[in-house]
């Protein structure tokens, strides 16, 4: 290179830059069988538009295993999704609120259940209110109740408690039940009913939604992955879909806290009978 630069009376750095520009740039890496994965990934992304590449990886691998094909790692799925413009926008929100360093998650199923309520707004102004009970280990929705244009009553919560106990236990013996301080949970009748079922009622501190973080996280997931991507013209339409949403969450939703397994898969792995659909 020095001899050429001296003969042409130019700087070596200039020649290096010329050579670098003439060199063919390396294209994006592709494996020969990426084309076999692309239709599967595209279908899953179309079906689950709110899922990122890790959850898409979990769903894709379930289907690959069923058909006897080797699984794909998340880096490969990420690369294929990036090359085809299927990645979600990066989350830029900042978490606000006080630090919560308590521990809500437990080491096995049926040690603690969490419960909360939320509402869904329909396009015509109807409101659908829901309450649910979720296991703090396997994240399965054990019982739920929904009502249109009315509030969740104490009797509905008590029915939900009984359904949860009957679903998980042959005998009446149940775990801690962690809720917020809503009146339907703190009512004397509800607390007495919980005690009769051998539930141990626990309530979060005032102004500390993080203490019921499993329930809060589920509400966020449910609204993002189901409510906001489906048509909700009125309460009747919403009520018709809710049962299917809960069933799909229990059977299919990959959860990062369960090593990307669904709640149903986690129950089966732990030799625990899941709630029937």
Question: What would you call each of these model-derived segments?
Answer:
Residues 2-7, 56:
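Short alpha-helical "recognition helix" segments of helix-turn-helix
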Residues 4, 93-95, 146, 174-181, ...:
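RNase H-like polynucleotidyl transferase catalytic core
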Residues 10-14, 36, 156, 189, ...:
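Generic alpha-helical secondary structure signal
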Residues 13-112, 262-273:
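Basic, flexible linker segments flanking DNA-binding modules
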Residues 31, 50, 66-68, 105-107, ...:
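Conserved, non-catalytic sequence blocks in retroelement Pol enzymes and Pol-derived host proteins
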Residues 75-134, 140, 156-174, 277:
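Mobile-element integrase/transposase regions
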Residues 135-136, 146-153:
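A short acidic/small-residue loop/turn micro-motif
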Residues 173, 195-197, 221-277:
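C-terminal domain-tail junction helix/linker
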């Amino acid at each position: 290179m020095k001899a050429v630069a001296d003969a042409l009376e130019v700087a070596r750095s200039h020649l290096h830059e010329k050579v670098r520009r003439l060199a063919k740039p390396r294209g994006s890496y592709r494996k020969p069988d990426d084309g076999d994965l692309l239709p599967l990934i595209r279908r899953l992304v179309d079906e689950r538009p709110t899922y990122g590449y890790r959850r898409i990886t979990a769903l894709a691998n379930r289907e690959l295993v069923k058909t006897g094909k080797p699984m794909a790692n998340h880096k490969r799925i990420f690369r294929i999704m990036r090359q085809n413009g299927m990645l979600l926008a990066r989350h830029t929100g900042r978490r606000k609120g006080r630090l919560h360093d308590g521990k809500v998650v437990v080491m096995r199923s049926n040690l603690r259940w969490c419960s909360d309520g939320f509402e869904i707004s329909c396009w015509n102004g109807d409101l659908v209110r829901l309450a649910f009970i979720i296991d703090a280990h396997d994240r399965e929705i054990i019982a739920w109740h929904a009502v249109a244009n009315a509030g969740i009553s104490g009797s509905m919560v008590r029915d939900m408690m009984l359904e949860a106990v009957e679903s998980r236990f042959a005998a009446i013996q149940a775990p801690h039940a962690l809720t917020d301080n809503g009146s339907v949970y703190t009512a004397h009748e509800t607390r007495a009913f919980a005690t009769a079922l051998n539930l141990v009622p626990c309530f979060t501190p005032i102004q500390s939604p993080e203490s019921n973080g499993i329930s809060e996280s589920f509400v966020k997931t449910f609204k993002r992955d189901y409510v906001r991507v489906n048509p909700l013209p009125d309460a009747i339409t919403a009520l018709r879909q809710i049962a299917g949403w809960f069933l799909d969450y229990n059977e299919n939703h990959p959860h990062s806290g369960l090593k990307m397994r669904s709640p149903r898969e986690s129950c089966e792995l732990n030799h625990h009978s899941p709630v029937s659909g």
